[in-house]
């Protein structure tokens, strides 16, 4: 249960997000069956969120907080750190495990 992080390509190994910092990421979100539900890459616009402010689902924030600058990783988020039993109607089914391909581009 929780978030599992699998490195696709390593970052600098030194610069990690701190509480209050803004993470600038590119991501693609998928269901376990591979169906894409969202992607900042498709919009060609990086996504920004502040660490510690619950602006994203818990698993996404927990995973990104453990990534170093420049790292690209696969985050597998179980329902307890995603959208849970409710899901997100029309997009995320109830009790769905979500997979994110996340690249930490910058910290502000």
UniProtKB/Swiss-Prot annotation:
One of its GO terms (biological process) is insulin secretion. It is found in: Cytoplasm; Sarcoplasmic reticulum. InterPro entries: FKBP-type_PPIase (IPR050689), PPIase_dom_sf (IPR046357), PPIase_FKBP_dom (IPR001179). GO terms for molecular function: calcium channel inhibitor activity; calcium channel regulator activity; cyclic nucleotide binding; FK506 binding; peptidyl-prolyl cis-trans isomerase activity; signaling receptor binding; transmembrane transporter binding. Disulfide bonds: none annotated. Signal peptide: none annotated. Keywords: Cytoplasm, Isomerase, Rotamase, Sarcoplasmic reticulum. Its main location: cytoplasm. It is an enzyme of class 5 (isomerase). Inhibited by both FK506 and rapamycin. Pfam families: FKBP_C (PF00254). GO terms for cellular component: calcium channel complex; cytoplasm; membrane; sarcoplasmic reticulum; sarcoplasmic reticulum membrane; Z disc. Residues 20-108 form the PPIase FKBP-type domain. Its EC number is 5.2.1.8. It comes from the Eukaryota. Has the potential to contribute to the immunosuppressive and toxic effects of FK506 and rapamycin. PPIases accelerate the folding of proteins. It catalyzes the cis-trans isomerization of proline imidic peptide bonds in oligopeptides. Identified in a complex composed of RYR2, FKBP1B, PKA catalytic subunit, PRKAR2A, AKAP6, and the protein phosphatases PP2A and PP1. Interacts directly with RYR2. Belongs to the FKBP-type PPIase family. FKBP1 subfamily. This is Peptidyl-prolyl cis-trans isomerase FKBP1B. It comes from Rattus norvegicus. The gene is Fkbp1b.
């Amino acid at each position: 249960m929780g978030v599992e992080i699998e490195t696709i390509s390593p970052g600098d190994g030194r610069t990690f997000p701190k509480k209050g910092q803004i993470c600038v990421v590119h991501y693609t979100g998928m269901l376990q069956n591979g169906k894409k539900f969202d992607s900042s890459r498709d919009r060609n616009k990086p996504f920004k969120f502040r660490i510690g402010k619950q602006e994203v689902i818990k698993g996404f924030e927990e995973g990104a907080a453990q990534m170093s600058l420049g790292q690209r990783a696969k985050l597998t988020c179980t329902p307890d750190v995603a959208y849970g039993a409710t899901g997100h109607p029309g997009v995320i089914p109830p009790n769905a495990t979500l997979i994110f391909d996340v690249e930490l581009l910058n910290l502000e």
